Amino acid sequence: MKHILALVVFIISFFCFKDVNCIKDFQLSPIESPLTALNKYDKFFLRMYNKMPRLEQSSTDYINGINMKNTIFVLYFYAKWCHACKLQGPELDKLEKNFGKKVHIIRIDIDNNEEIAKKNFIKALPTTIIIKNKVILAKNEHFVTSNELTSTIRKHL
């Protein structure tokens, strides 16, 4: 009886798997290197990611009366109702004391400035963006200590 049952299972499994290709017939594609040269579309999107939209439309390179050339700006996006933003504020105050006029911090309340938040793709709060010469140096979408911000800024001064 056991032999008959084993034979029936073997015959049924043979008919069930008759359409499955044999492993010998399967052709493996050559392994591609994960590091490939950037194509023109990748370069375009990389350039778009690194360039920062202007805060105010003007023919000069000034934001709020401050020349953007060789100046580091910290854009700080927050909301009054955000608990982590309330913790981030004092950290930025420490940063202002450390660097003085070398670093300019612009605080942007997303409840009052929704357009700017949309242009900068703000998805989480608090968000801190460090910019120099209109290029994003760092973007943090979480709470960041003043020591972490200081080390990032010192690399680019």
Swiss-Prot record:
According to its UniProt entry, the function of this protein is described as: Participates in various redox reactions through the reversible oxidation of its active center dithiol to a disulfide and catalyzes dithiol-disulfide exchange reactions. As part of the translocon PTEX complex, plays a role in the export of parasite proteins into the host erythrocyte. The translocon PTEX complex is a multi-protein machinery resident in the parasite parasitophorous vacuolar membrane, responsible for protein secretion into host cells.
A Pfam family recorded for this sequence? Thioredoxin
Q: Which UniProt keywords apply?
A: Disulfide bond, Electron transport, Redox-active center, Signal, Transport
Q: Which CDD domains match?
A: TRX_family (cd02947)
Signal peptide range? 1-22
Give me the disulphide-bonded residues: 82-85
Q: Tell me which residues make up the Thioredoxin domain.
A: 46-157
Null mutant phenotype reads:
Mice of infection with knockout parasites have reduced blood parasitemia due to a slower growth at the ring and schizont stages. Parasite burden in vessels of lung and adipose tissue is reduced. Also, the development of experimental cerebral malaria is delayed. In infected host erythrocytes, surface expression of parasite antigens is reduced.
Q: Which residues constitute the catalytic centre?
A: 82, 85
* PANTHER family recorded: GEO12009P1 (PTHR45663:SF11)
State the Gene Ontology terms under molecular function. Answer: protein-disulfide reductase activity
InterPro entries linked:
Thioredoxin-like_sf, Thioredoxin_domain
* PTM remark: The disulfide bond between Cys-82 and Cys-85 acts as a redox-active center and is reduced by thioredoxin reductase TRXR.
Q: Which GO terms describe its cellular component?
A: cytoplasm
The entry assigns this protein to a family as follows: Belongs to the thioredoxin family.
Q: How does it assemble?
A: Monomer. Component of the translocon PTEX complex composed of HSP101, EXP2, PTEX150, PTEX88 and TRX2.
- Name of the protein described by the UniProt record: Thioredoxin 2
